[in-house]
Regions:
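Surface-exposed, charged secondary-structure patches
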Residues: 71-119, 224, 228-229, 236, ...
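C-terminal soluble interaction/assembly domains
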Residues: 260-317
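Short beta-strand edge/turn micro-motifs at domain boundaries
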Residues: 29, 108-152, 159, 286-290
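Bacterial N-terminal signal peptides that target proteins for export
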Residues: 2-15
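C-terminal motif of bacterial Sec signal peptides marking the signal peptidase cleavage site
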Residues: 21-25
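Short, well-ordered alpha-helical segments enriched in acidic and aromatic residues
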Residues: 59-71, 178-185
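Flexible, glycine-rich surface segments
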Residues: 168-273
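Short, low-complexity N-terminal intrinsically disordered segments enriched in polar/charged residues
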Residues: 26-53, 101, 139-163, 167
Length: 317
């Protein structure tokens, strides 16, 4: 890969900017269909306090009751761990400071935290003089914040994974005679066949240790053969590259070991909700992105080689 070294750093601001009420991971209770209408309130302060209460409760039906029809697919993302962290951030920011700002059209916007971050769903008064959150008006802003945050984080993660593979290749593992890349992200128990393993005295450190440590602070768990989204994205390894890659087509595998290179693909767990762009990166440090459309899950799952043909665009650092 290139000589550039990427830091494992995902700015806290990326999490804070996603201040939306999305608590799919707050409770194991299954939620029902969207409620018939959004809940109404006597005043903006009443609305804000109710919002805080449901955020703290983890009651998913209560959340949907606040926002009304059409809110389920907007406020719930495909990443329960991320959703839980988002709610915690909202609660902390609201309790630290909150106020309402009146807009020219008469609606009210909730500002929270010391930085006065705007809650994406405006509060509007109906003909009866009651207030309700306008989920339709906030939809685009909610998705834009979530998708933007996730994609920026995934770009950082892709770079960290590439650096981890380079570090893994620089050492010999499992008493191997030849240097090779890791075949998986999380090692099987008692082995070093993945980029992460539990540290032990006298053994080299895990290349993916810093990223896993960071992820664990957010509530993610390192488990072998697990298929759960990280920052709204799924990650898979690729074991070959196609003719459009630098150096042409080649198989990375030699005698069951990944010797000739490596590549990853990262795609959104729920297209249009947790992300839009799909990313691929290989041993040369070349990171590309492409919008695979509504069939992203099926299309990305079928990709088995790093082949940035037409439509794949380099990601500028």
């Amino acid at each position: 890969m290139s000589g550039k070294s990427r830091r494992v750093y995902i700015a806290p601001q990326l999490i804070v900017l996603a201040l939306i009420i999305a608590c799919a991971g707050c409770s194991n209770k299954s939620y029902k269909a969207d409620t018939p209408s959004a809940k109404t309130f006597t005043s903006p302060d009443d609305a804000g306090n109710s919002l805080l209460e449901v955020a703290k409760s983890g009651d998913q039906d209560a959340v949907l009751g606040i926002f009304g029809p059409g809110s389920k697919e907007i406020v719930f993302s495909a990443d329960p761990v991320q959703d839980k962290a988002t709610v915690a951030t909202f609660v902390a920011s609201y309790e630290a400071m909150h106020r309402w700002r009146k807009m020219p059209d008469g609606s009210q916007i909730l500002l929270i935290g010391a930085d006065n971050l705007a809650f994406p769903i405006p509060l509007k008064k109906n003909e009866s003089g009651q207030w309700a959150f306008d989920i339709a008006a906030g939809r685009d802003e909610i998705l834009a914040r979530r998708i933007g945050r996730n994609e920026l984080a995934v770009i950082d993660v892709c770079g960290a994974l590439a650096d981890a593979q380079a570090e893994y290749f620089s050492q010999r593992h499992n008493d191997g005679k030849t240097k090779h890349y890791a075949l998986k992200f999380i090692s099987d128990p008692g082995t070093q066949n993945g980029l992460y393993w539990q540290s032990s005295e006298g053994q080299p450190r895990s290349p993916l240790g810093p990223l896993v440590a960071f992820a664990s602070t957010e509530g993610y768990k390192a488990q072998a053969n697990s298929h759960v989204p990280f920052h709204g994205y799924y990650f898979h390894m690729l074991n070959r590259q196609g003719s459009h890659a630098q150096g042409g087509a080649k198989d990375y595998m030699v005698d069951g070991k990944m010797v000739n290179g490596f590549a990853f693909i990262a795609y959104p767990a729920e297209y249009g909700n947790s992300g839009v762009m799909t990313f691929i990166i290989n041993q040369d440090g070349a990171l590309f992105q492409k919008d695979l459309g509504k069939t992203t899950a099926e299309t990305a799952a079928a990709i088995n080689e790093f082949d940035p043909e037409s439509g794949w665009v380099p990601v500028e650092e």
